[in-house]
């Protein structure tokens, strides 16, 4: 991540290109910046919801189980 600003554009580009059917598909700099911001917000929201779920279960540590419980609703919200 670039400081606190989000994911590196190179990483976002690589993630996107892994799922493109045509290897010649290009992504503009603005689109990469937008996707990086989207991913930053998504990960932050997942972390916050994981904390809320852990607190609801009276746990001090967020584990994979809490993230798995909040993921379906998180995906629907995004």
From Swiss-Prot:
It is found in: Nucleus; Chromosome, Centromere; Chromosome, Centromere, Kinetochore. It comes from the Eukaryota. Its main location: nucleus. CDD domains: HFD_CENP-X. One of its GO terms (cellular component) is inner kinetochore. GO terms for molecular function: DNA binding. InterPro entries: CENP-X. This is Centromere protein X. It comes from Mus musculus.
């Amino acid at each position: 991540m670039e400081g606190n600003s989000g994911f590196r554009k190179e990483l976002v580009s690589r993630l996107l290109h892994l799922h493109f059917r045509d290897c010649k598909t290009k992504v503009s700099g603005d689109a990469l910046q937008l996707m990086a911001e989207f991913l930053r917000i998504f990960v932050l929201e997942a972390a916050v919801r994981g904390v809320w779920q852990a607190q609801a279960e009276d746990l001090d540590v967020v584990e994979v189980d809490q993230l798995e419980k909040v993921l379906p609703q998180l995906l629907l919200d995004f």
